[in-house]
């Protein structure tokens, strides 16, 4: 019997239907010598730390780094997963041959291999079904040419290294930074890929926040209704352009050069997943996750090919199928396909290139047409279909005309007078033949991706070299503008190139090898950062939150938030797939990196040799008797950071943190509006001090202090699970849990216990066997004990 494993039930149904397997069993299909069963994604996972060593269950700095000698696997915890795994194990054990039919990619391979290992069937012979669409024809061809399972060992090793390295780096970094810098009950989640992505967003937001607009002036002149600009560029002062303006006013403008060239703009390359996500975000505002979800659904319904691809080309052997596919697509896109001569298709190496196809070719429609689509799915399908159709259109031909002109000023007669001619330039664009761009003629420039855009049309008069005449020079003032915040399209682009900005198609392809994440994981990385409140969506932009910015400020180890470092790791994983890099060497590098994290976290988070710069004028801050003030106070700057804020003494160390990182590292017992609560002190760019409750930033509710701590000088603060001392970070262990022996302890009870040393007789406690009893709570040497009532 041959057992086929798919990644999800819907794919199992499709394969069963195609192979005429009609007998439905509990957890599998059976017939014609096959049993087809399925997973629900990752049914098998890496074990938790305490499953290797019970000591690792408790979070402590002493136990770090946590690195298992050998990773183990466990079944996912939910009942449905356990039941299905047992079915798979029974079928695998009895099988003569196993066929892996999970998604044809890194994660699909990992899902299968982990299950194969967990079921103890590693010695069983197995084959690999590798297909790029789920049409019946593709499935039949795939089963007719099954691959040897071990041919994909490189893919599995890369997936295994990715899984284990994420576990090691993520777990150790998260525990390290939570233990060192987290507030009570809070969690600082750090990931091998997510943290560098967060750092990119934080850096962009800082560039915008710190941007100072500068005035500039441009010299233009209007000649025969055409706008010419001065070739010397912008001026950073008004005097120079005014001097030139005075020199050329009233003198003739002469055309010195008229040059034209024809530009051929080829159709855009086909979509890979990242480009599809970027395009749908620009066109329709879809998130990366929404686009992937729609594309995956269209793939599972057999309307699109495999979406999780990083290729933008097709293979040579697909050429014969292009005409039949275009003929099929006429049903929905007859008007767009009509101009194409299907008997003389343009099949260039730019689109059909085996060397540029990795695991899967570009995303294209299949011959299985959808019925009436609506909503986001329709937008995704139409985008893929139009991009595919555009590949067979002729190029867009444009005529680019560059015109140079000049004005000869009078002879020099004073300081600042121009020497020689004042030169100007203008450029015009005319479309001779729109070619493929007719498919996008109704869209604005902002809706088109860069590969679908050309120069805006600008028609010039018929200039002749040597002609001259009057003109109207002018000065146009302006201000520099800040960088734009990331939207999903621009963030995906920067993730794809590991933090490097690039528009060139060839260079972009090279940088893809060192991207942040993979096409199939980038959407989930963005969603995880949003879920963890490190970034937020504001309309179409992605902005860092206070929590996200604070986390990045805490991480002293630049490599942990480095896009280039993570990009290098991704490149090595790709090489492991290709058997070009030793997986053991990769894991050794990851382990060495993790071992150094603890040492690097001891580095100062700020420059302790200086206080910092004034938020108002950027001059150095100096220490005074009552506060920390701006050194430029004689020039009128009035910034001062007082040495006591909200009842909290501000030490020099805390002032460094506020001036350099905008907030204190630790929380303090802040007194504000007759309340005392645990909060971090903050300083904004206007020089105003404030405080941030842990409730909003660390997801743990901190209320007013209910009493003084009986063990130290701290305050007893109400948190989610307990009444605890605000000085817990400094070693105070005073805690009254909110639930004791199944009874809820109210704030009033805790206050009485703290003020008098005991509560009254309390009813409603329950023993481990469920027997109710009454007792008093007493405070003995800072510990809560029970004084049992006598009958």
Would you name each region that the model predicts?
Residues 9-16, 33-36, 40, 78-92, ...:
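Amphipathic alpha-helical transducer elements in NTP-driven molecular machines
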Residues 138-223, 260-264:
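C-terminal or mid-to-C-terminal helical accessory/interaction module adjacent to the motor/catalytic core
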Residues 1-163, 167-169, 444, 482:
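Intrinsically disordered, low-complexity regulatory segments
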Residues 1, 103-104, 184-187, 260-269, ...:
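Conserved short loop/turn motifs at secondary-structure junctions
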Residues 2, 81, 118, 174, ...:
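Basic, low-complexity terminal or inter-domain segments flanking catalytic cores
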Residues 238-271, 277:
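Metal- or metallocofactor-binding catalytic centers and their adjacent structured scaffolds
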Residues 8, 414-416, 466:
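Glycine-biased, low-complexity coil/linker segments
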């Amino acid at each position: 019997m041959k057992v086929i494993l798919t990644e999800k039930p819907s794919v199992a149904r499709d394969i069963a239907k195609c192979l005429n397997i009609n007998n439905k069993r509990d957890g599998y299909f059976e017939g014609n010598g096959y049993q087809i069963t399925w997973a629900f994604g990752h049914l098998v996972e890496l074990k938790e730390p305490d499953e290797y060593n019970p000591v690792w269950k408790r979070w402590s700095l002493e136990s770090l780094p946590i690195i298992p000698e050998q990773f183990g696997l466990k079944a996912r915890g939910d009942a449905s997963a356990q039941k299905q795994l047992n079915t798979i194990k029974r079928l695998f054990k009895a099988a003569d041959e196993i066929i892996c039919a999970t998604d044809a990619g890194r994660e699909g391979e990992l899902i299968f291999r982990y299950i194969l290992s967990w079921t103890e069937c590693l010695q069983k012979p197995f084959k690999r079904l590798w297909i790029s669409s789920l049409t019946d024809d593709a499935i039949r061809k795939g089963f007719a040419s099954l691959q040897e399972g071990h041919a994909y060992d490189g893919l599995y090793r890369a997936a295994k290294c990715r899984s284990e390295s994420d576990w090691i780096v993520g777990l150790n970094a998260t525990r390290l930074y939570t233990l060192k810098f987290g507030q009570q009950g809070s969690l600082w989640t750090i990931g091998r890929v997510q943290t560098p992505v967060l750092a990119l967003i934080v850096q962009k937001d800082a560039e915008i926040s710190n941007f100072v607009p500068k005035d500039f002036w441009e010299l233009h002149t209007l000649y025969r209704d055409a706008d010419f600009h001065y070739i010397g560029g912008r001026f950073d002062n008004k005097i120079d352009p005014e001097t030139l303006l005075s020199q050329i006013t009233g003198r003739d403008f002469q055309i010195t050069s008229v040059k034209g060239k024809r530009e051929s703009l080829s159709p855009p390359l086909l979509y890979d997943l990242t480009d599809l996500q970027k395009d749908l975000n620009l066109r329709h505002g879809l998130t990366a996750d929404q686009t992937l979800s729609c594309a995956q659904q269209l793939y599972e319904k057999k309307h699109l090919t495999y979406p999780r691809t990083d290729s933008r080309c097709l293979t040579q052997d697909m050429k014969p199928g292009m005409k039949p596919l275009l003929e099929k697509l006429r049903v929905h896109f007859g008007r767009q396909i009509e101009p194409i001569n299907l008997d003389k298709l343009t099949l260039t190496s730019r689109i059909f290139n085996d060397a540029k196809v990795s695991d899967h070719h570009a995303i294209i429609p299949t011959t299985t047409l959808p019925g009436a689509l609506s909503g986001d799915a329709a937008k995704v399908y139409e985008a893929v279909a139009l991009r595919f159709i555009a590949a067979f259109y002729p190029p867009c031909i444009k005529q680019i005309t560059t015109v140079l002109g000049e004005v000869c000023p009078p002879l020099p007669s004073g300081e600042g007078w121009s020497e020689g001619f004042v030169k100007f330039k203008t450029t015009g664009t005319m479309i001779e033949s729109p070619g493929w761009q007719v498919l996008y003629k109704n869209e604005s420039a902002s809706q088109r991706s860069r590969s679908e855009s050309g120069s805006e049309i600008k028609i010039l008069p018929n200039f002749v070299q040597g002609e001259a005449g009057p003109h109207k020079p002018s000065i146009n003032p302006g201000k520099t503008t800040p960088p734009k915040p990331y939207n999903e399209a621009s963030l995906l682009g920067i993730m794809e190139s590991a933090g490097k900005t690039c528009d060139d198609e060839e260079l972009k392809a090279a940088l893809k090898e060192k991207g942040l994440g993979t096409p199939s994981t980038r959407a989930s990385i963005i969603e995880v950062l949003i879920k963890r409140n490190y970034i937020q969506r504001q309309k179409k932009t992605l902005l860092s939150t206070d929590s996200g910015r604070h986390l990045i400020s805490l991480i002293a180890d630049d490599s942990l938030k480095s896009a280039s470092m993570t990009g290098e790791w991704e490149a090595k994983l790709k090489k492991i797939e290709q058997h070009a890099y030793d997986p053991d060497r990769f894991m050794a590098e990851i382990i060495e990196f993790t071992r150094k994290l603890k040492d690097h976290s001891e580095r100062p988070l700020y420059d302790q040799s200086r206080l910092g710069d004034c938020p108002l004028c950027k001059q150095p801050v100096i220490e005074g008797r009552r506060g920390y003030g701006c050194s430029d106070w004689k020039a009128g700057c009035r910034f001062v950071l007082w040495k006591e804020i909200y009842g909290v003494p501000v030490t020099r160390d805390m002032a460094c943190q506020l001036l350099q990182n905008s907030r204190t590292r630790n929380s303090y017992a802040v007194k504000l509006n007759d309340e005392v609560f645990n909060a971090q002190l903050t300083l904004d760019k206007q020089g105003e001090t404030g405080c941030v409750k842990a409730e909003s930033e660390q997801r743990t509710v901190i209320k007013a202090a209910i009493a003084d701590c009986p063990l130290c000088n701290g305050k007893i603060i109400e948190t989610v699970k307990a009444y605890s001392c605000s000085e817990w970070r400094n070693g105070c262990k005073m805690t009254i849990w909110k639930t004791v022996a199944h009874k809820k302890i109210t704030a009033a009870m805790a206050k009485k216990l703290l003020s008098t040393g005991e509560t009254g007789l309390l009813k409603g406690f329950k023993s481990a066997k469920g027997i109710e009893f009454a007792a008093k709570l007493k405070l003995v040497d800072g510990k809560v004990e029970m004084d049992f009532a006598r009958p």
